């Protein structure tokens, strides 16, 4: 195969056969370089034409398992090649053949969220309630991986939502609650699952959610089951009754060693790491020979031979990195010898099936595979396209995905002390900085705004946009340069780790801006809380003063009531004197002399009237004057008491 160019697209790469590097100057014919794809590899990397050719020849057993115990349908179902799955199903392959772990193609598709493939498999008679060696059904696998749409699809297809796995006694609802999948828990509750079911330790789904700090799920389950007894909310001796404030506390780590999760997309890179001898740290051994293979070639050698001996190279079956049991296989039914990948892999132009070969550059194998277990299969292709388009703009000489540089420590550790750069001091003016990042043409824009280097280093992305830097590329370069200046990092370059560091620095700067805003919001909230506390203290003091004023008012009212009662008694006496005086005037007869010199009668009304009849007219007149004087004094006291009540009540008494 001719050397691949940087402009080669992914379909062009997939349509070419695999090739090997036989050393510099070695003359090898094109026929010897061609390595045909077997059916399992073609199904795993999405080679529809190769699979179609194998199906049409009718010479191969489509249900045959490879050394790892996987069929072509399993690979296509796991990766998500729906066209190949449809082709194999039309050819009549078996849909319920399990792997050595007991996982059917439906379980593999469910673990990766491939909803369309699960639909095809169910249409062809796939058993929905079939269990693997752990006792997990397809519903368990998609629930554990967090694929919401797949869970809803299986529930609508009639999956048993109350099934239990035998190890811990978990139901799918318990698995979702313990893992924190809130939307999946919502689906199960809407489906009507048993929320009061307990596992082998006596814990319910609500207890598991509370134990691992998923308080939103706890509140969600409380809204769906408000009448549950409190005995279900607390397990004796094992689970404490946590308050709602526990959500702010760090949740315990979920460690479940007794239970194994379903198939993960990360198993592919791990398997490839064991094949190639490269650890998950992303560091490959350094080459011990001077000859380096050209771009686009992969070296092969026998595991027991010296890497320098190129005569031992031969073809082999391509081992898929997805099924880790492929590594354990020591023999194959084919006549070709079994060889392992050389530990010193050269640069490889990889497709979706060989992205794990990025470990040859010292990069992380897990990061080289575009995986998102918490999202559905529809999001994978768009994320992969965005990653590739981003790398074309950041580093046109490299075709590795941007996520392949997540293991920065392993990559940077490979640089020798002689190649490390000197400490970066930074440019002295704005023109030098802009020239360094390739944005010198924008110097005039900053000069018009009177922006020097000191002001430039304080600008944010929104400030640059306001000044007039509207293009995304220059704006990102400037924000990365500002972030690098503040972090005293090295200047930007063309290396892959520097491109990744630029993106991280920009994200860190944006996070710092958001943190500053949040701190300001927290300070404003604290000020509001202080104001509310002061207002509360003022209101409490006002209430205390009102209570004291009310008590004084009640005391004054009691005194006024007593004075009014005395005034009423004097008024009755005055009326009696007036009545007697009126009767005497009408009779026009002088009273007897025996009544002269009588003392003031008692205050009793009956005795008062009897004594008035015995008084003379002058005495009666004097008694009337005395009663009028007492009446005036009583009214004066009542008026004074009412005036005191006016002050306490806050308004004039006579105004009412």
Swiss-Prot record:
Q: Which cysteines are joined by disulfide bonds?
A: none
Which residues are recorded as modified (3-hydroxyasparagine)? Answer: 96
Q: Region (Interaction with NEK7) spans which residues?
A: 1-422
Looking up SMART domains in the UniProt record yields: ANK (SM00248), SAM (SM00454)
Per its UniProt record, what InterPro entries does this chain match?
ANKS3_SAM, Ankyrin_rpt, Ankyrin_rpt-contain_sf, SAM, SAM/pointed_sf
Phosphothreonine: modified positions: 319
In residue numbers, the region (Disordered) covers 235-265, 277-312, 346-425
A Gene Ontology term for the protein's cellular component: cilium
Residues annotated with Phosphoserine modification: 2, 5, 201, 225, 243-245, 320, 368, 371, 375, 541
Q: Where in the cell is it found?
A: Cell projection, Cilium; Cytoplasm
Q: Which UniProt keywords apply?
A: ANK repeat, Cell projection, Coiled coil, Cytoplasm, Hydroxylation, Phosphoprotein, Repeat, Ubl conjugation
The coiled-coil regions, if any, are 501-526
Share what the entry says about its subunit structure, partners included: Homooligomer. Interacts (via SAM domain) with ANKS6 (via SAM domain). Interacts with BICC1. Interacts with NPHP1. Interacts with NEK8. Interacts with HIF1AN. Interacts with NEK7; this interaction alters the subcellular distribution of NEK7 by preventing its nuclear translocation.
Report the domain remarks: The SAM domain mediates homooligomerization.
What is this protein's record name? Answer: Ankyrin repeat and SAM domain-containing protein 3
- The UniProt gene name for this protein comes to ANKS3
């Amino acid at each position: 195969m001719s050397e691949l160019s940087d402009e080669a697209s992914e379909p062009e790469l997939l349509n070419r056969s695999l090739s090997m590097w036989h050393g510099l100057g070695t003359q090898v014919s094109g026929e010897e370089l061609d390595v045909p794809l077997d059916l399992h590899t073609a199904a795993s990397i999405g080679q529809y034409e190769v699979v179609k050719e194998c199906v049409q020849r009718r010479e191969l057993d489509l249900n045959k398992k490879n050394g790892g115990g996987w069929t072509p349908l399993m690979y296509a179902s796991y990766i998500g090649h729906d066209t190949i799955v449809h082709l194999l199903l039309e050819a009549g392959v078996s849909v319920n053949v399990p792997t050595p772990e007991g996982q059917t193609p439906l379980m593999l598709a469910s673990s990766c969220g491939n909803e369309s493939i699960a639909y095809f498999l169910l249409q062809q008679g796939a058993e929905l309630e079939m269990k693997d060696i752990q006792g997990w059904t397809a519903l368990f696998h998609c629930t554990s991986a967090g694929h919401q749409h797949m869970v809803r699809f299986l529930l609508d297809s009639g999956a048993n939502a109350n099934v239990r796995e035998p190890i811990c006694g978990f139901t799918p609802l318990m698995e979702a609650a313990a893992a924190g999948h809130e939307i999946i828990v919502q689906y199960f509750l809407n489906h009507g699952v048993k929320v009061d079911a307990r596992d082998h330790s006596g814990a319910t789904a609500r207890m598991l959610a509370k134990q691992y700090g998923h308080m939103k799920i706890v509140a969600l389950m409380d809204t769906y089951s408000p009448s549950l007894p409190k005995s279900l909310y607390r397990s004796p001796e094992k689970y404490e009754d946590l308050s709602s404030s526990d959500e702010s506390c760090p949740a315990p780590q979920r460690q479940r060693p007794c239970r194994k999760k379903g198939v993960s997309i990360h198993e592919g890179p791990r398997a490839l790491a064991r094949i190639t001898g490269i650890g998950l740290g992303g560091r490959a051994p350094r080459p011990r020979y001077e000859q380096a293979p050209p771009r686009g070639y992969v070296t092969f050698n026998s595991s027991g031979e010296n890497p320098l001996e190129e005569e031992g190279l031969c073809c082999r079956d391509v081992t898929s990195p997805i099924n880790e049991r492929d590594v354990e296989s020591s023999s194959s039914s084919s006549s070709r010898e079994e060889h392992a990948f050389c530990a010193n892999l050269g640069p490889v132009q990889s497709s979706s099936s060989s992205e794990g070969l990025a470990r040859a550059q010292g990069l992380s194998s897990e990061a080289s595979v575009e995986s998102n277990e918490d999202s559905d299969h529809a999001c994978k292709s768009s994320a992969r396209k965005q990653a590739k388009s981003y790398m074309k703009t950041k580093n046109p000489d490299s075709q590795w995905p941007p996520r392949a540089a997540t293991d920065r420590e392993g990559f940077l550790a490979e640089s020798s002390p002689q190649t490390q750069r000197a400490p970066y001091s930074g440019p002295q003016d704005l023109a030098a900085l802009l020239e360094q990042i390739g944005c010198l043409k924008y110097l005039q824009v900053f000069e018009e705004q009177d922006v020097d280097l000191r002001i430039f280093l304080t600008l944010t992305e929104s400030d640059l946009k306001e000044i007039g830097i509207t293009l995304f590329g220059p704006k990102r370069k400037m924000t990365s340069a500002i972030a690098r200046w503040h972090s005293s990092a090295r200047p930007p370059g063309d290396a892959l780790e520097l491109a990744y560091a630029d993106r991280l620095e920009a994200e860190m700067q944006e996070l710092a801006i958001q943190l500053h805003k949040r701190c300001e919001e927290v300070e404003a909230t604290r000020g509001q809380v202080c104001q509310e506390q002061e207002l509360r203290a003022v209101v409490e003091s006002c209430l205390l003063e009102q209570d004291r004023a009310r008590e004084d008012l009640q005391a004054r009212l009691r005194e006024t009531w007593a004075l009014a009662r005395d005034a009423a008694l004097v008024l009755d006496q005055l009326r009696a004197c007036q009545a007697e005086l009126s009767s005497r005037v009408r009779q026009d007869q002088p009273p007897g002399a025996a009544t002269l010199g009588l003392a003031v009668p008692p205050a009793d009304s009956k005795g008062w009237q009897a004594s008035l009849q015995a008084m003379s007219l002058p005495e009666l007149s004097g008694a009337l004057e005395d009663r009028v004087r007492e009446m005036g004094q009583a009214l004066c006291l009542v008026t004074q008491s009412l005036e005191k009540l006016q002050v306490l009540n806050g308004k004039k008494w006579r105004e009412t």
